[in-house]
Design a protein with these regions (language model features):
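N-terminal secretory signal peptides
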Residues: 1-10
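N-terminal export leaders
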Residues: 12-20, 24
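Signal peptide processing junction and immediate N-terminal pro/mature segment
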Residues: 31-39
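Flexible "cap/lid" subdomain of the alpha/beta-hydrolase fold that forms the substrate-access gate
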Residues: 39-69, 75-80, 85-88, 116, ...
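Active-site glycine-rich loops that stabilize anionic/oxyanionic intermediates
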Residues: 86, 94-97
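Serine-hydrolase catalytic-loop signature spanning alpha/beta hydrolases and amidase-signature enzymes
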Residues: 96-104, 115
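Active-site machinery of serine-nucleophile hydrolases
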Residues: 110-120
């Protein structure tokens, strides 16, 4: 039985690989092979709609002393962990992770700051709203409003922001839509979304293939990822992480718990669809209006990742900001806060320290 299950798993992974090739290249010969495999043993995989309930032990271990609650915003229910006293700091995660990505940094940061670590809508244990017209409910604007309302729930009209990957794109929108709320912003391992799409080349499209796969119309990406979501998730993490062992088993287990369900797979696809549809329209409108970030910006990126080698990161953000833009690379891949937590903590403390 174990050998049979292993063979089925391998067939599912081969089907996922072939399906991706067919979807991204328009190849017509491959689907016949896929269909043959599906007819033999590729029965529909039964995935839960929502993530299983989290274990309190995991939260206590990864975020000792943090409290957690759900904040009802005007468009979603946001799960957030919080701890500390001092200037408020909002930490935002990216794809395909959750707030857990901050587990090596947030507890130490909470020694000096009031730290808030939410799951973005559609991710982790936050809710999954309906898509909305042109994927509006998963736009960075909708996600930014969640964060404003979450911080106001805790009594904060102004705050500091540290954000990674998709969360950093939410932070960019937060700075544009609510300029008086963000005192400083640290943007990690991204260049501006509009800049990246406009300057896409073969190397970027190859290394960040999910940027172009996930924007395809439903249910294509959802179906293909759903064939083996654990493999897809762990492949994504492995190609972006350049520091062996940096992603702890406890963290990966949480990413797996939250990602491997139908609602998360769909919601995270909607995130990418929104960014390339209505999100780019919003960015273009800001460019035309001269709407730029007014808060001081500190950019960090992985020297062994994709963004730094392909873009002049500081130059891209100076083009989008009116205040000072500082930053540097760290010797790692994409997941700075997990691969280089001590340096990331030092950068955040230094940047946020003079408010």
């Amino acid at each position: 039985m174990r050998e049979q299950n292993s063979a089925i798993t391998m067939n599912r992974r081969e089907t996922l690989r072939l399906s991706l090739v067919a979807a991204l290249t328009g190849t017509s010969a491959i689907p016949g092979k896929i269909q043959a495999m599906q007819d033999s043993d590729m029965k529909a995989i039964s995935l839960p709609e929502l993530p299983p309930k989290p274990s309190g032990d995991v939260a206590a271990k990864l975020f000792p002393g943090f409290e957690q609650t759900e904040v009802r915003t005007s468009g979603a229910s946001i799960r957030v962990l919080y701890k500390g006293a001092g200037p408020p700091v909002l930490l935002l995660h990216g794809y395909p992770e959750t707030h857990v990505t901050w587990h090596k940094v947030a507890p130490r940061l909470a020694e000096r700051f009031s730290v808030y670590v939410p799951d973005l809508r559609g991710y982790g244990d936050s809710s999954r709203p309906a898509d909305g017209d042109r994927h509006l409910n998963y736009s960075f604007r909708a996600m930014a409003l969640d964060q404003i309302e979450t911080m106001r729930h805790f009594g904060h009209e102004q705050f500091l922001v540290g954000a990674h990957d998709r969360g950093a794109r939410v932070a960019h929108r937060l700075c544009l839509d609510f300029p008086k709320s963000v005192k400083k912003v640290c943007l990690m391992d991204i260049a501006p979304t509009l800049t990246m799409y406009r300057q896409t080349n073969q190397e970027f499209a190859t290394k960040y293939m999910w940027w172009f796969f996930l924007i395809q119309a439903a249910p294509l990406p959802e179906h293909l990822i759903g064939l083996d979501p654990q493999y897809y998730l762990e492949y994504n993490l492995s190609v972006l992480n350049k520091t062996p062992g940096a992603l702890t088993p406890e963290a990966v287990s949480e990413y797996r718990r939250c990602f491997c369900c139908t609602s998360t797979i769909h919601a995270t696809c909607e995130d990418f669809r929104a960014s390339v549809d209505i999100g780019l329209k919003m960015d273009e409108a800001d460019d035309r209006a001269g709407n730029k970030i007014v808060a001081p910006v500190h950019a960090l990126w992985g020297a062994r990742g994709t963004i730094g080698p392909l873009w002049d990161v500081l130059a891209t953000w100076r083009a989008k900001a009116t205040s000072t833009v500082t930053g540097r690379s760290l010797d790692c891949g994409h997941f700075l806060q997990e691969e280089r937590p001590e340096e990331t903590l030092e950068e955040l403390q230094r940047f946020f320290g003079t408010v």
